[in-house]
């Protein structure tokens, strides 16, 4: 969730370094623009806000043009508008064929982005299916309530 890069490396330098490792990288400048950091290319990574760094890390994950991307707590540190913008972009990438493996503690994010979910309890999978199936199996109307019940966190809440 936090990158460790050369202290003074600039956004464009980091993106170029990643892109040069791949034969057909994505257009990282376009990705930066889409993720709202296109005007930060000459800034040092360390000077970016937490939300800007988080969006940069998503861009870095997408530069290789993957068919599958793993995103861990991808919107941590983002404000509500930035979260929605990231969701919109990722939804479009998903429509274009990108498979997203997402870990999140934000159930609204899971509901918005995930076709299938896996709920864990003490490191063990206790549910696999859709959000609607989770609500039906748990007897809850809201997905967050279903998650809490299935994960065993309901009593702790």
Can you name each region flagged by the protein language model?
Residues 16, 20-40:
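Conserved ABC ATPase "signature" region
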Residues 44-48:
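Conserved ABC ATPase signature
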């Amino acid at each position: 969730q936090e990158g460790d890069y050369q202290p003074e490396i600039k956004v464009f330098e980091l993106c170029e370094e990643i892109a040069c490792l791949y034969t057909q990288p994505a257009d990282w400048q376009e990705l930066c623009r889409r993720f709202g950091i296109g005007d930060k290319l000459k800034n040092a990574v360390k000077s970016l806000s937490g939300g800007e760094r988080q969006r940069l890390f998503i861009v870095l994950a997408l530069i290789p043009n993957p068919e599958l991307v793993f995103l861990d707590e991808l919107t941590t540190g983002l404000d509500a508008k930035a979260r929605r913008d990231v969701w919109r972009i990722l939804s479009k990438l998903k429509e274009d064929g990108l498979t997203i493996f997402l870990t999140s503690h934000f159930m609204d994010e899971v509901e918005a982005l995930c076709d299938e979910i896996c709920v864990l309890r003490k490191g063990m999978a206790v549910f696999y299916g859709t959000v609607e199936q989770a609500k039906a199996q748990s007897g809850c109307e809201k997905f967050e309530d279903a998650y809490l019940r299935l994960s065993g966190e309901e009593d702790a809440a």
